[in-house]
């Protein structure tokens, strides 16, 4: 983790990227905000009831003098953001509905990003993934040419660094969806300084098993390779389908997939379903001892990232750094 953060911190030095932390009444978030404020990487904007935040700060002896605190219920920005929301959701939300929605810290924070008052958002310490992602999908929306957002995790232990996806967002994926996630994950890997070798995972290696699920991954591989070529991702390798051991162990790859472009040296893993991805990253985290940073959402016009409700202060800090780095891309 230290290597990734040090690379990102070098890129962020002096940038003071404005990142919204909507859950300012959560002590983990507030402590992380004070730590971030001491850097020149991130300038946090904390949302919540100001009295509650100040009481929490007093309890933990935190200095808030340099931190911007906004209470959505009383903010002078509320009317401006309501009007912008109604315009963005034209025909889908009345002004009265917008006023009510923007009392919600995640909607308010997402509108700060959409209107350019902030550059990214990190939430989820006290909210579900849906509560964090829904406003982003409605307001910020996906990039041109991208039909969905997806969630990747950086899996880090010592010098080892991998990307797992999709582990958080899409419960049902067809071949086209898997292909899109593979290409977006490759782009994410590149943007964080990795040389992407993307393995499309299955319970089959290079046709060793036959089923509709295997066929879906094989079709996704072909589509992903075509999309990568169309997007001119010249230095990206995408191959499959692989069982996990064939994707990560050279001696196994030599036996199961001789001649494959990836010979046990994959660093980006695209799981065939959300169940597999979510279970896989948690096994690596809990049994393998890997730090799991994320989910980092990809495919949006501006970065919005989702914490686990079991996150630590360190997780909030780290994901804020990653979000700031995304904002500069």
From Swiss-Prot:
Q: Provide a GO CC annotation, any one.
A: cytoplasm
- Pathway, per UniProt? Metabolic intermediate biosynthesis; acetyl-CoA biosynthesis; acetyl-CoA from acetate: step 2/2
On the tree of life, the source organism's domain of life is: Bacteria
One of the GO biological process terms: acetyl-CoA biosynthetic process
Q: What class of enzyme is it?
A: transferase
Q: Which UniProt keywords apply?
A: Acyltransferase, Cytoplasm, Transferase
The UniProt record lists the keyword Cytoplasm: yes
Provide the catalytic activity annotation.
acetyl-CoA + phosphate = acetyl phosphate + CoA
Q: Name one Pfam family in it.
A: PTA_PTB
The Swiss-Prot or TrEMBL record annotates one GO molecular function as:
phosphate acetyltransferase activity
Q: EC annotation?
A: 2.3.1.8
Major subcellular location class: cytoplasm
**Cystine residue pairs:** none
Q: Which InterPro entries match?
A: P_Ac_Bu_trans, P_AcTrfase, P_AcTrfase_dom1, P_AcTrfase_dom2, Phos_Acetyltrans/Butyryltrans, PTA_PTB
Question: NCBIfam families annotated for this entry?
Answer: PRK09653.1 (NF007233), pta (TIGR00651)
Which named protein is this?
Phosphate acetyltransferase
